């Protein structure tokens, strides 16, 4: 018996767990009691509890000792004590995977399963199914069928749930129990009906027609179980998504009808299903939103929370649909449950008007200190969305964010605020100086290294372009004096960027950098020495290449290439063009967050997608000597429909003078094996097909890869755009679908694929230039050309910008892909690297009158990339 002071002991942490210091050997020794007669039920049940505790705590039981304990436990079936019998069932289930010859208890369990004691029958079914494998299942099939339709609900449910588990290993046997499951689905018991429907669905889930018939049958006759209704709603919504069904479908009508069910859980499940259906219009959402609106005033906190959480999700895509609930949501702002209040506020922030923002900010500030960091992050994300929606309100929102930044909080919370402030600075030029000033104050007392270095990077990028850049120097240099090495290194880089862009400040910056040369840390000293030497040259090209824009290569790729160079010494200097370019802009790489504690741990450099392709292609003898891989297409191109007999996807790999087309092929016919599979290509331009590398064998549903190597045009190197007609050729061998054995003889066949396009974007790799003007000056005007074009089919600047960026495959710089409102002129700045490692920059001036006129100026370190860009645009 538990004593009265046990609760107090539990709270104090002393003596609360009677099994805390159990030893496996002692417990197994105690298990010998099972062999004694007469059986002591209380003592034996206590020992079984200890064994179960050890197993669930992860204690390893050897096969021999587990088997001995299991066999001893089987003798306890001689006792009729109900508690001991239930403990035996639990022990059988837990030890079924550890002990050997557990089937010895089959007869005892079968006897209990078919006996008159109802309290034994359900657990006996579950235990029996746990020890039964696919070879023994047919022996108990008759008993299982009887149990499924048993009039005792606990027995029927046990059999149905056990059948569901058995589906994984014995699908064909369990499938024969469908008639019994259908009979159980008509039960008046809510759990039996629910479990029966679950079994029926999992048996038929791969047959869409059968699932549709099942839904139709049960929705027509109605269901008694609210759990069954919830499951049918989920099945129906999944079916709607898979079939991309119209909202006129009977399935949607069924889900909508469940909004009028008498059970709250069914009503909520239906509302949740509707709002989560892709492509739902505001009109179709209206009934679900109305139901959720009613739940907002429910006396049950769980219902209010569910409603406001779902409305919050709806507001992300359809804020206008939730506007009708604003009054109810405002009432929830003062809810005693802070989670509900926070969700209500963030939903209002997404749906509220511009005029209500000030009032909402005051309401939020009244309880921000009372909610957890997790919900504070939700509030910050809502404010970020609001800044994009109402840019004129950025001053009010930024002041609120700055007050939040000064409060106590964890890393994720502070990072969310900093992210939001930076996004406001990037979107609103007039907020830049205010935002930078507040961030300067924040890093004066910032405990998070990742955030401090990120803000210093931002100051180095944006600070020199402000009206009074010198005011930021004090804050940056304070970091050099007061912070640890990682932040000091970031501060040195930021100082160098000010010196590289402002000649008046250069002497002062050089003085500060000379002080940093004596730093204790190697990284800080090296950076200061490097930047000092570059800045003292007073050359814009050097500043742009080594300070303002830096390397655009993959850092893991650079590490691997340098390691390989040291392992295989060469008289030739290291060639930076052999390193793959960064697949993501470096600005994005720097902002990726890493926990501060993990920053100093050695990391294993993961191979990028392009490096994996590089290794795969280098292993093909025909591709030796092609040089480093320049670019792989970001997404494979589908050359067949997904439902056809052969599924072919192509990835384009670009080298300096060649292209390799990688065809990933899947044969979906189970009565055929394909051999010597190649894709024959016919180019429309001066490309030359050099060789085909076949996929030797393509069995059913096993992917294989073949390649086609082509040489780039030499006579007219500007003709890079090309259309290839593709035909897959192969040898077909018929095979037995069951065994997979193919015939010895085969026959030649072919399959026409979709045409494959090669565009200028396949020859240019995106590169981010943080300072486009510096990069423009660095490249110089030796190879500069300019032409004017009319885009007659395009009617807006936004459309023109989007089309140009996509067509050229270059990276928009300095947020020039964002077109300001109510403007009829815009300048788009694009940067990239042409195959061979040549920088290519494009400045495109756009003018909107009746159509869009575009003046394109291109610069490169070589003439060919400029000619190709202008020829492609023309």
Curated annotation (Swiss-Prot):
Ranges for the HEAT repeats = 64-101, 283-320, 322-355, 356-392
* Keyword Plastid found: no
Q: Which domain of life is it from?
A: Eukaryota
GO cellular component terms given for this protein:
COPI vesicle coat; cytosol; endoplasmic reticulum; endoplasmic reticulum-Golgi intermediate compartment; Golgi membrane
Name the UniProt key words of this record, in alphabetical order.
Answer: Cytoplasm, Cytoplasmic vesicle, ER-Golgi transport, Golgi apparatus, Membrane, Phosphoprotein, Protein transport, Repeat, Transport
Q: Where in the cell is it found?
A: Cytoplasm, Cytosol; Golgi apparatus membrane; Cytoplasmic vesicle, COPI-coated vesicle membrane
- Annotated region (Interaction with ZNF289/ARFGAP2) at 609-874
What residue spans carry the region label Disordered? 1-21
Which residues are modified to Phosphothreonine? Answer: 594
Q: Which GO terms describe its biological process?
A: endoplasmic reticulum to Golgi vesicle-mediated transport; intra-Golgi vesicle-mediated transport; intracellular protein transport; organelle transport along microtubule; protein secretion; retrograde vesicle-mediated transport, Golgi to endoplasmic reticulum
Principal subcellular localization: cytoplasm
- KW Repeat (keyword) present: yes
Biased composition (Basic and acidic residues) is annotated at 1-11
- What is any Pfam family matched here? Coatomer_g_Cpla
- Enumerate the InterPro entries for this protein: ARM-like, ARM-type_fold, Clathrin/coatomer_adapt-like_N, Clathrin_app_Ig-like_sf, Coatomer/calthrin_app_sub_C, Coatomer_g_Cpla, Coatomer_gsu, Coatomer_gsu_app_Ig-like_dom
**Any idea which GO molecular function terms this record carries?**
structural molecule activity
Membrane-protein topology: Peripheral membrane protein
Family note: Belongs to the COPG family.
Give the protein's function.
The coatomer is a cytosolic protein complex that binds to dilysine motifs and reversibly associates with Golgi non-clathrin-coated vesicles, which further mediate biosynthetic protein transport from the ER, via the Golgi up to the trans Golgi network. Coatomer complex is required for budding from Golgi membranes, and is essential for the retrograde Golgi-to-ER transport of dilysine-tagged proteins.
Question: Subunit composition?
Answer: Oligomeric complex that consists of at least the alpha, beta, beta', gamma, delta, epsilon and zeta subunits. Interacts with ZNF289/ARFGAP2 through its C-terminal appendage domain. Interacts with EGFR upon EGF treatment; interaction is essential for regulation of EGF-dependent nuclear transport of EGFR by retrograde trafficking from the Golgi to the ER. The coatomer interacts with KDEL receptors; the interaction is important for retrograde trafficking of KDEL-bearing proteins from the Golgi to the endoplasmic reticulum. Interacts with COPB1. Interacts with TMED10 (via C-terminus).
Name by which UniProt lists this protein: Coatomer subunit gamma-1
Organism equals: Bos taurus (Bovine)
The beginning of the lineage is:
Eukaryota, Metazoa, Chordata, Craniata, Vertebrata
